């Protein structure tokens, strides 16, 4: 019997997958636990529409990420920090501070965890900070660290 999985079932199938399973297993386990439905023409068509809709949403997310990447290339974020001699900072500028400055100065909200800045910025001047905007789209934020 062909079934469409509505949830992941360990060792059997993932959500949205169409598989052949024994009739008894389908009737006594999958249907009773509501983890699968029978693969009727109507259900298959509905699954196809859901997949198409999900694909369109994914394409829109990628387009939005590319637009944000282009916007980030054209701007600069200015962060102030206390520094000593030679342009060395007392402490460092963190991803959280950069995210807050980006929100305040340009009204762009980016999660600090998406910034690839493991040790922070330790010197005055310009720094390019890599940002993971999407699984497929990476960008950079140009950060200008100035003395307070």
Curated annotation (Swiss-Prot):
InterPro entries to which the protein is assigned, alphabetical: Ribosomal_bL9 (IPR000244), Ribosomal_bL9/RNase_H1_N (IPR009027), Ribosomal_bL9_bac/chp (IPR020594), Ribosomal_bL9_C (IPR020069), Ribosomal_bL9_C_sf (IPR036791), Ribosomal_bL9_N (IPR020070), Ribosomal_bL9_N_sf (IPR036935)
GO cellular component, one term: ribonucleoprotein complex
Biased amino acid composition, Basic and acidic residues: 52-65
Keywords for the protein's UniProt record, in alphabetical order: Ribonucleoprotein, Ribosomal protein, RNA-binding, rRNA-binding
Annotated spans, Disordered: 46-65
Protein function: Binds to the 23S rRNA.
Origin species: Staphylococcus carnosus (strain TM300)
Superkingdom in the source lineage: Bacteria
Protein name: Large ribosomal subunit protein bL9
Statement: the UniProt record of this protein carries the keyword Ribosomal protein: yes
GO BP annotation list: translation
